[in-house]
C-alpha cells in the first residue's frame, strides 16, 4: 500500500499509540494523575474497581476502527465522484 492511504494509516496508528500510552513517566494512581479533578477524589469503597487502561484501550480501539472506516468510506466516495466527473 503506497500513497496517501498508507500515510494516513501511519498517522492513525501513531495517534492511537499516543492516546493509549498516555503521558511518559506518569506514575499510576498518583496524586494529580489523570482521573482526578482538582481535589475531588473518590475515596469510597466500590463493588468493583476497573483499571483505566481496561476501559480506555477498548474505547480507543473502537474509536480508531470507526474513524478508519469513516475515512475509507469518504475516500471511496470522493474517488467515485472524481471518476464520474472526469468520464
UniProtKB/Swiss-Prot annotation:
It comes from Human herpesvirus 2 (strain HG52). HAMAP family: HSV_GN. Its main location: virion. This is Envelope glycoprotein N. Envelope glycoprotein necessary for proper maturation of gM and modulation of its membrane fusion activity. Also plays a critical role in virion morphogenesis. Coiled coil: none annotated. Keywords: Disulfide bond, Host Golgi apparatus, Host membrane, Membrane, Signal, Transmembrane, Transmembrane helix, Viral envelope protein, Virion. Residues 73-87 are intravirion. Residues 26-51 are virion surface. The chain crosses the membrane at residues 52-72. It is found in: Virion membrane; Host membrane; Host Golgi apparatus, Host trans-Golgi network. Belongs to the herpesviridae glycoprotein N family. Residues 1-25 form the signal peptide. It is a single-pass type I membrane protein. One of its GO terms (cellular component) is membrane.
Amino acid at each position: 500500500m503506497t500513497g496517501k492511504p498508507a500515510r494516513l494509516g501511519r498517522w492513525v496508528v501513531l495517534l492511537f499509540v499516543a492516546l493509549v500510552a498516555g503521558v511518559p513517566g506518569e506514575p499510576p494512581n498518583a496524586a494529580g494523575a489523570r482521573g482526578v479533578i482538582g481535589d475531588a477524589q473518590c475515596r469510597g469503597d466500590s463493588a468493583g474497581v476497573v483499571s483505566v487502561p481496561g476501559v480506555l484501550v477498548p474505547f480507543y480501539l473502537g474509536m480508531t476502527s470507526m474513524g478508519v472506516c469513516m475515512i475509507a468510506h469518504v475516500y471511496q466516495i470522493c474517488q467515485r465522484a472524481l471518476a464520474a466527473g472526469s468520464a
